[in-house]
Amino acid sequence: MKITAIIPARYASTRFEGKALADIMGKPMVQHVYERTAKASLVSEVIVATDDERIAAAVHAFGGRAEMTSRVHETGTDRLAEVAARLDSDIIVNVQGDEPLIEPAMIDEAIKPLAEDSSVMMGTLKTRIKTLHDFLSPNVVKVVTDWEGYALYFSRSPLPNFRDKWNDLKDEAFASRKLLCYKHVGLYVYRRDFLLQFAQMSPTYLEMAEKLEQLRVLENGYRIKVVETDYESIGVDTPGDLEKVLERLKK
C-alpha cells in the first residue's frame, strides 16, 4: 500500500506572507514540516504542493520533492487533489504546511483506520478541549462523534451545547474530564479516489455557513473517521505564533 503525504504550501498569506519560508532555527518552516512528516512510519513518500517557485526551490535545496500547482485554487484540498491526480498512491495524507511541530505519531494515528479497514474513505483527528476559552472560541473547531468514532458534526460553536450546565463551564471541569469535549485537529487522510471525488463536489450549505470544508463530506452522505490523539501542535498563522514555536523548540 502506497501512502503519500502532501503538504500544501502557499507563499501568499493574509496574516503572514511567506510563512512557509520563515526561518526556524536555521531551516525554513516547510522543511521542519517535511522532515517530521517523513518520520511517520506509515508514510511512503512526502511531497510539497506549491504554486510558488521560491517554495519549490527551498524544498529542492534540502533534498525534498515539490510539485507545482495552479495558482487559482480556492482551497488547499483543490491543490492537494491536483497533485494526487498525478500519483498512483492508495492513500493521501494532507499535512498542514504551517505546523512545524507536528508529531509523526499523529500522522500514523490518522492513517491507521484507512490502512486497516477498506470501508473507511476519510479520516482525521481530535483532541480533548482543556479550557473554557477553547470551548467558546470560534477559532477552535469542535467535533462530536458517534460511538464508533465517526463524525456527527463539526462546528465553530460550542459542541455539545450544555443546556443545563452553563454554570459548570469552568477550566477545571474540562481539565478534570468532567466535561468531555473535543477540538478538531486539521490533519486529513483520504483514499486517493475519494479525494478526487470530494474535490469535484460543489460547496454545501453548512460548509459555507461554518466555513468548514469537511462538512461537504458529511452533507453528501459520507462518513469521516475521527481518531482521538493526545498530541497537540501549534499552527503558525502570525509572527506571534512563530515565536511560540521557537520557545518550545528551545526548551
From Swiss-Prot:
The protein's UniProt keywords, in alphabetical order, are:
Cytoplasm, Lipopolysaccharide biosynthesis, Nucleotidyltransferase, Transferase
Q: Can you state which reaction this protein catalyses?
A: 3-deoxy-alpha-D-manno-oct-2-ulosonate + CTP = CMP-3-deoxy-beta-D-manno-octulosonate + diphosphate
This protein's pathway: Nucleotide-sugar biosynthesis; CMP-3-deoxy-D-manno-octulosonate biosynthesis; CMP-3-deoxy-D-manno-octulosonate from 3-deoxy-D-manno-octulosonate and CTP: step 1/1; Bacterial outer membrane biogenesis; lipopolysaccharide biosynthesis
Query: Which Gene3D superfamilies does the UniProt record give?
Result: Spore Coat Polysaccharide Biosynthesis Protein SpsA, Chain A (3.90.550.10)
Q: Which GO terms describe its molecular function?
A: 3-deoxy-manno-octulosonate cytidylyltransferase activity
UniProt entry tagged with the keyword tRNA processing: no
Q: Is Aminoacyl-tRNA synthetase one of the keywords UniProt gives this record? A: no
Q: Which CDD domains match?
A: CMP-KDO-Synthetase
**Location in or out of the cell:** Cytoplasm
Q: What GO cellular component term, any one, is given?
A: cytosol
Name the HAMAP family for this protein.
KdsB
The protein's job, in short, is: Activates KDO (a required 8-carbon sugar) for incorporation into bacterial lipopolysaccharide in Gram-negative bacteria.
Which family does the entry's similarity section mention?
Belongs to the KdsB family.
Q: What is the name of this protein?
A: 3-deoxy-manno-octulosonate cytidylyltransferase
User: Native species of this protein?
Assistant: Geotalea uraniireducens (strain Rf4)
Q: Which gene encodes it?
A: kdsB
